[in-house]
Amino acid sequence: MEDLAGFTGAGLNLTLPNVVGFDNLVAAITRVWASPFTARAFGWRQSHMTAPEHVYTSILLLESVASDKSGVLVTQDIDNGHSGVISVAVNEGLGGAVDGQAAESLRIDLETGAVRVLATATAPRRRVPDPEGGLIRLPSSGSDVVLQAAEIRQLIDFAQHLPDRFPPIVDDQGNPAPADVEFGFLDGDLRLFQLRPFLDSRMTGGIAYLHQMDASLRDSHKVRVNMEETPRTERRPRTC
């Protein structure tokens, strides 16, 4: 349900990083399971779906990786759509580029390896896993660059061989689409966390897409609801 035709729910539902301990994990599953039914999540779906109550939840459990740096890669130039260039945003620590921190932004030519720097990482702190659970913030290294040459070569190799290693990436119309990849580096080795069709630029727009969806809800406070009435739901034909 996170990615549907004309709708991306990236960042809409709850993600809990680095949950430590069995009891804490069970409690976290309950919170994540319920998150599609918060007023915020339900309201956004209601603006774009005819039956937003039809949500069939699944949860993905991933082992936490204490990445030295992490980011997002799109297999095209997000400014002009050129497929011979990859767009990369990366920060020190965990998840900074995904969550809108000021990231190192690069365009990397897949054929020549040439790198064009659009922005440098200026976030003063990086997020790292706390052994007791959750994340803590530590000072960033202050380095002028985040990605090193060897790491850039790994990203180029990954992007070049992606079509051979994974099923075709297509949009909701079945047409070829660029890949949106979340990655990290641990001790110089590339780690892949997520791969999906590229529907929206989280690197350039942050959560602008969700803010756009918010716009349709701005007048919702004017709607009056009779709490004694039975909620109206969409009627669907049933087969026996």
Regions found by a protein language model. Give the residues of each.
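Conserved mixed alpha/beta core segments that line enzyme active sites in large multi-domain catalysts
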Residues: 1-215
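N-terminal, non-catalytic alpha-helical interaction modules of very large eukaryotic scaffold proteins
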Residues: 205-240
